[in-house]
Swiss-Prot record:
Site features described as Interaction with target DNA, chain residue numbers: 73
GO MF terms, alphabetically ordered: deoxyribonuclease V activity; magnesium ion binding; RNA endonuclease activity, producing 5'-phosphomonoesters; single-stranded RNA binding
Protein name in UniProt: Endonuclease V
Cofactor: Mg(2+)
Superkingdom as given in the UniProt entry: Bacteria
Length: 223
């Protein structure tokens, strides 16, 4: 595995990320959520992609792609491991979204290329990174109140918003993926909340990927 070459690719790709709002439809008609996981001891990469109507946030389509894992887990290079399955799930969708929430980092990455940015560049779609853990940067401690907010900073640059979406829950790290500004990324996540820690697009993607009770109930109620 030539990490020097991958690192150079990351730096080059990151320079192409658009950090301002370039949505083709604003507000969007369809918002997608994407979640990647691994099965069979990491040998299979599974990507779930869901489509929600906006503003109702009604689930209208979901696809799950499973492909052979092409790369081992290497911290800092996760997007190379995850994007092939995301592309496979993307190709399965019968209609394409105007905005994608990706479970993972956007520019809040040491070389500014998390999976949300990498995927957004590959398919040229506006993306937002919604991550559950910090990868780099620093932020001031948040109060315990829901809605507490602080910028995630690294070398004088804001990479994300750290936002406590729900009381007694760890905060989310919300970042530009591609073609969405950091402030708009936060605003879109806030518009897509329904009382859970995660916004609806990534909550549904996780539910589909892991066959959680919410998804089991949904499928049971389908004609």
């Amino acid at each position: 595995m030539d990490l020097a070459s991958l690192r150079a690719q990351q730096i080059e790709l990151a320079s192409s990320v658009i950090r301002e709002d370039r949505l083709d439809k604003d507000p969007p008609d369809l918002i997608a959520g994407a979640d990647v996981g691994f099965e069979q001891g990491g040998e299979v990469t599974r990507a779930a992609m869901v489509l929600l109507k906006y503003p109702s946030l009604e689930l209208v389509e979901y696809k799950v792609a499973r492909i052979a894992t092409t790369m081992p887990y290497i911290p800092g290079f996760l997007s190379f491991r995850e994007y092939p399955a995301l592309l496979a799930a993307w190709e399965m969708l019968s209609q394409k979204p105007d905005l994608v929430f990706v479970d993972g980092h956007g520019i809040s990455h040491p070389r500014r290329l998390g999976v949300a940015s990498h995927f957004g560049l590959l398919v040229d779609v506006p993306t937002i990174g919604v991550a559950k853990k910090r990868l780099c940067g620093k932020f001031e401690p948040l109060s315990s109140e829901p809605g507490a907010l602080a910028p995630l900073m690294d070398k004088g640059e804001q990479l994300a918003w750290v936002w406590r979406s729900k009381a007694r829950c760890n905060p989310l790290f919300i970042a530009t993926g591609h073609r969405v500004s950091v402030d708009s990324a936060l605003a879109w996540v806030q518009r897509c909340m329904k009382g859970y820690r995660l916004p609806e697009p990534t909550r549904w993607a996780d539910a589909v990927a892991s066959e959680r009770p919410a998804f089991v109930r949904y499928t049971a109620n389908q004609p």
